[in-house]
From Swiss-Prot:
Catalytic reactions of this protein: AMP + ATP = 2 ADP
Signal peptide: none
SUPFAM superfamilies assigned: P-loop containing nucleoside triphosphate hydrolases
Keyword DNA damage in annotation: no
A biological process from GO: AMP salvage
Region called LID, residue ranges: 122-159
Pathway: Purine metabolism; AMP biosynthesis via salvage pathway; AMP from ADP: step 1/1
Top EC class for this record: transferase
Residue sites binding AMP per the record: T31, R36, G57, L58, V59, G85, F86, P87, R88, Q92, R156, R167
The name this protein goes by in its record: Adenylate kinase
Cited InterPro entries: Adenyl_kin_sub, Adenylat/UMP-CMP_kin, Adenylat_kinase_CS, Adenylate_kinase_lid-dom, P-loop_NTPase
Pfam families: ADK, ADK_lid
Length: 218
């Protein structure tokens, strides 16, 4: 099973990716995780990426493609993989097509932007442990404090409403066109194109999971 998971930032791709990867025994390839690891390590590419991400922009194609090409060459990708957050742009999709990367499905998780803003701007985290909360959906026992240590929770810059809105704007301009790209390719050349499927990403985690797994068996 080789697939791309599409959807706006905050659409719940990471949660559903974990279920899909478990079901099919494939690795999740998240450019976000790869970038955060580079930022944490303080590599030159990581430092570049940090400045771009904190301004709400997207990292360059060259940097992302170098990370991804290296990743899918690893042995654990032999039986398939799930791309979460890649490709982000038409040029990236073209580059992947040109490289002959075989894909079975493109699955879109569709969530209204108003829901995404509420989801993301309400996130809070405890930096030392990585524990996460949500002011509405998963609040801490004491407002603004970690349940275990009582230490202050923070709002990541990535989750501030202004940054979220900027990221959604960038998504609309650069990544949303991939929906048309893959659906048009599937209609024009069904023999070689991945199957394109879209599901609603609003509802319980379990409901969305069942929609996703049903879409990937159709």
């Amino acid at each position: 099973m080789r697939l791309i998971l599409l959807g706006a930032p905050g659409a719940g791709k990471g949660t559903q990716a974990a279920f899909i990867c478990q079901k099919y025994g494939i690795p999740q390839i998240s450019t976000g995780d790869m970038l955060r690891a580079a930022v944490k390590a303080g590599t030159p590419l990581g430092q570049q990426a940090k400045a771009v991400m904190e301004s709400g922009g997207l990292v360059s194609d060259d940097l992302i493609i170098n990370l991804v090409k290296e990743r899918i060459a690893q042995p654990d990708c032999a039986g398939g993989f799930l791309f979460d957050g890649f490709p982000r742009t038409i040029p990236q999709a073209d580059a992947m097509k040109a490289a002959g990367v075989k894909l079975d499905y493109v699955l879109e998780i569709d969530v209204p932007f108003s829901d995404i803003i509420e989801r993301m701007s309400g996130r809070r985290s405890h930096p030392a442990s990585g524990r996460t909360y949500h002011v509405k959906f998963n609040p801490p026992k004491v407002e603004g404090k970690d349940d275990i240590t009582g230490e202050d929770l923070i709002q990541r810059k990535d989750d501030e409403e202004e940054t979220v809105r900027k990221r959604l704007e960038v998504y609309s301009q650069q990544t949303r066109p991939l929906v048309d790209y893959y659906s048009a390719w599937a209609k024009a050349d069904p023999a070689s194109a991945p199957k394109y499927r879209a599901i609603q990403g609003v509802g319980s985690v379990e409901e969305i999971k069942q929609r996703a797994l049903a879409a990937l068996s159709s």
